[in-house]
A protein has these predicted regions:
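N-terminal lobe/hinge region of extracytoplasmic solute-binding protein
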Residues: 37-85, 116, 194
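A structural "hinge/loop" feature
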Residues: 38-56, 77, 104, 168-179, ...
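Aromatic- and charge-enriched surface segment that lines or borders ligand/interaction sites
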Residues: 80-127, 293
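Surface-exposed binding/hinge segments that line
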Residues: 127-183
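Gly/Pro-rich hinge or "lid" segments in bacterial periplasmic/extracellular proteins
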Residues: 161-223, 227, 237
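Ligand-site clamp/hinge motif
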Residues: 185-187, 216-261
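Ligand/substrate-recognition segments at binding pockets and active sites
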Residues: 206, 345-407, 447
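Detector for C-terminal structural segments
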Residues: 302-334, 368-378, 396-474
Length: 474
């Protein structure tokens, strides 16, 4: 009897271990491959100059000194950051184990040479970010030499001097324009690019991009994904439909913009996630036909008064994206007063509208831009009787244009550096912005995205980036 019991216990124990082994084996068999989709467009993979959703690829392939997170930064290529009491001098001490994907060492001198190369060769608007460095803008405009620029190297430390104090300069350097570069990349095919991020390109075709782990990445041991497979699809609806068919793990920014006419459906799905970003929408006034009336500050203030960013966030984007500045839904009293004030200014200036409608421009095939623009233009037409035509035809003289910009830091006031650079203003505070209105501010965009539950470690940073190296599939 004892022998029988012993045999029974042995059999049961073996079965239990076998089941445990099966579960372990099953867990190990989970494919660490992340599937998503991006637009079918031209990709150059150049941190100095990129377009559209290309930033989503650059942040996987390249790495800067820091990564932006909800509060402050994560140190990645540096072991420490120091700054002077007045925040004008910054010292970045780099890791000693940094390498390019081809094994070549990365040092502080690599960053110094890369930043100078960007000042010499970048034709992107993003180069303005470097202009906060002492002497950088003059060097960019070929007025001085390298010795006048506030960048130098001591041992493996990158020492940066700024024109003015910037308390969050460690956030600024998380943006791609500050990434290190390899000059050879200009002559290399996309699948041969030399990179320093967690992934590198293993295959690039017209229909698919495949990324694989970079074995020379300093933190490769913590990169769980083996591959990233990105389908390239031109049509937004077709790309979106890949998610409910389980062909992809994730859909949305920063890889693909959510199609506007699918937002209603998206909001009913349990896989929906919403993340705040530092992307800001506004309406600029290029005024290419030189109508002095639209340069009148009081007119611009009235145009801003009747706008309704709250409506845009709640009804158009459907995710409560907030107004850039506190701006409640305009009441009928506010609208009526704005209308009266507008007519007084118009009459006093003896101005008559053009017989040809003024052009309000949005990008071709961008339905979200069109809806956001229309929601404001209809108020300008309704309250002020301004003849305006909303179109994506850029051949006509543009008077108004809807635009957005990704600040890439946690400080909304950093938007003013871009506004000052692009529109020639000198704004330093919210009060100055609202008193001068170089553009009509609208809202801060929140991103609505879709992710299946098997994707763990997913997070959109305030700059709208996703670092896939932190993701694993379960």
């Amino acid at each position: 009897m004892k022998i029988f019991k012993f045999l029974l216990v042995s059999i049961l124990t073996s079965l239990l271990f076998a089941c445990g082994d099966d579960r372990t084996e099953e867990s190990e068999k989970i494919e660490q491959v992340f599937y998503t989709v991006m637009p079918k467009q031209e990709y150059k993979l150049n941190p100095q100059s990129y377009f559209g959703n290309e930033r989503a690829l650059l942040t996987q392939l390249f790495e800067g000194l820091t990564e932006l997170k909800t509060e402050g930064v994560r140190l990645v290529s540096v072991v420490s950051i120091e700054h002077s009491d007045d925040y004008k001098e910054w010292i970045f001490t780099l890791r000693n184990d940094l390498k390019w994907s081809d094994g070549e060492k990365i040092t502080a001198s690599t960053y110094l040479d890369s930043w100078f190369d960007s000042l010499e060769n970048s034709n992107s608007n993003e180069v303005y970010r470097l202009f906060v460095i002492k002497g950088a803008e003059d060097y960019y405009n070929k007025k001085t030499d390298r010795t006048s620029v506030g960048i130098k190297v001591q041992d493996n430390k990158l020492i940066v001097s700024l024109n003015n104090p910037i308390k969050n300069f460690d956030e600024w350097v998380s943006n791609p324009i500050f990434y290190p570069i390899r000059k050879e990349n200009r002559d290399l095919s996309l699948d041969k690019k030399i990179v320093n991020g967690a992934f590198k390109v293993s295959n690039f075709t017209n229909d698919e991009i495949i990324l694989e782990r970079n074995e020379n990445y300093w933190d490769k041991i913590n990169t769980k994904l083996k591959e990233v497979k990105i389908s390239l699809v031109e049509d937004g609806i077709m790309a979106y439909e890949m998610f409910p068919r389980n062909e992809i793990d994730y859909f949305g920014e920063p890889f693909y913009s959510m199609p506007f006419d699918r937002l209603n459906q998206v909001n009913t799905l349990p896989e929906k996630l919403i993340f705040p970003t530092s992307r800001y929408w506004y309406i600029s006034i290029p005024n290419e036909n030189k109508e002095k009336f639209f340069e009148n500050l009081e007119i611009k203030k009235l145009m801003y008064t009747v706008s309704d960013p709250e409506f845009m966030g709640k009804v158009i984007l459907e995710n409560d994206s907030p107004a850039i500045f506190s701006h409640s839904h305009p009441s009928s009293d506010i609208l009526n007063k704005a209308k009266e004030d507008f007519e007084k200014i118009k009459e006093k200036s003896n101005f008559n509208f053009s017989e040809t409608p003024y052009v309000a421009y949005f990008e071709n095939n961008n339905l979200l831009e069109k809806k956001l623009l229309l929601s404001t233009i209809k108020e300008w037409i309704g309250q002020f009787k301004i003849p305006i035509r909303v179109t994506s035809n850029s051949d006509l003289g543009i008077t108004f244009r809807i635009e957005k910009y990704l600040v890439g830091t946690n400080n909304m006031n950093d938007l003013y550096y871009y506004i000052n650079y692009k529109y020639g203003s000198n704004i330093k505070s919210d009060e100055e912005f609202l008193n001068t209105l170089p553009v009509i501010p609208l809202l801060q965009e929140y991103d609505t995205v879709l992710s299946h539950s098997n994707v763990r470690g997913l997070n959109l940073t305030p700059s709208g980036d996703i670092y896939l190296k932190y993701i694993n599939i379960q």
